[in-house]
UniProtKB/Swiss-Prot annotation:
This is Doublesex- and mab-3-related transcription factor A2. May be involved in sexual development. PROSITE patterns: DM_1 (PS40000), DM_2 (PS50809). SUPFAM superfamilies: Cysteine-rich DNA binding domain, (DM domain), UBA-like. It comes from Xenopus tropicalis (Western clawed frog). Transmembrane segments: none annotated. Residues 254-289 form the DMA domain. One of its GO terms (molecular function) is sequence-specific DNA binding. Gene3D superfamilies: DM DNA-binding domain (4.10.1040.10). It is found in: Nucleus. Keywords: DNA-binding, Metal-binding, Nucleus, Zinc. It comes from the Eukaryota. CDD domains: CUE_DMA_DMRTA2.
Amino acid sequence: MELNGPPVSQLPQTATSTASLPVTVAGTLLRGPQLLLRAAEKYPRTPKCARCRNHGVVSALKGHKRYCRWKDCMCAKCTLIAERQRVMAAQVALRRQQAQEENEARELQLLYGTAEGLALAAANGIIPPRPAYEVFGSVCTEGGTDSKIQKFDLFPKSLIPRSVTPQLSSGGKPVSPDSESVSGSAPGASSPEARPGSGSENGDGESLLSSPISKALKEGEESPSSISPLGSESGSDAEKDEQDPSSSSSARQRTPIDILTRVFPAQKRSVLELVLQGCGGDVVQAIEQILNNRGQDKSEETWSRDGALPSIQPSVSSTHRPLIAGALTPAIGTLGSRSAFSPLQPNGAHFGTEANAYQLGGHLGLNPLRLAYSAHSRGLAFMAPYSTAGFMPTLGFRPPMDYAFSDLMRDRANVHKDQVYTNGLYGPVVNNNAEKQ
């Protein structure tokens, strides 16, 4: 009987194995969520709460920060964790800001180009300005006169003839040697407010780049001794005041003989040294002597032609100048013909735009400043702006041909009034004013 049936001990084992199978399946189905499991079992890379870990508890970080039981703990470990979190948050914020600025700069580069986009981004404060783009702000940060000098350094000097190049002032208009002599004799005579009519003296340095080209090329055909129009000669007193602060840096580095050679490039250096030595090193007086002596090189025909002035109605080509004393007097507002408040004057052609029209120094034998500031001209200046061209035809100055070079250093202010005003027009009025003073 033992050989026919299986052993009795094997029957309950199979029954127990079949009965335990559904129990294990039900156990796997009844487990909780996997986020609540310990880190040792599964998903060890899940973020955990650091404060709970300091106190021996492992908690998943998702949705746990508000409900953490140690969120207000002030122990040493929790304080260190809070400091680390603050540093990490600052680093993340900085990286986000840098990434945003780079994106905005990249968008500006796509819209405006590389250089303009970076310059625009630096101007808007998106990115800090770099040294490569400091050129855009160098002109604006300097003063007004320095900016004018810098703009004219960029001007191509090769377009200007050699005789006109040293006569360019920092104000942007060519100045003749005669106007420099007038301005040099009395540098502090008048204020810059006496020139309201001109364009470049009002401070608009942007209009300076176009004006010197036409003016310089227009006067380039004349000799270095050519005379500028009435505006640059009569207004040179105020021009000197404007030139002094702007050209002070360059004038400090030049010697007097260098200034003379720059003003008179056609003269020999030895002659200029002799004149400067005779004037005691005074550059202004040396320039005045050279300009006064230059007119005596002319022939007798030139003197007779310049002396025969029409007395009724001057033409365009005449060298007739009736209002020289009134125009040179700064007490009535220098640039009388350009002022908006002065009476109407004849046109610019009447005042002799051609060369040798206003050369007072040579053939008139009078220093323009002494004529302007003398007692006679002060009396004449109050009537000269209100007189027409035909009403006061000419000032009969006697051309002294017999004066030597050394005699020009004399003071012509003591010349008798009958010798200066030979025509007798306005003689009593002028003489009375002279006697009162």
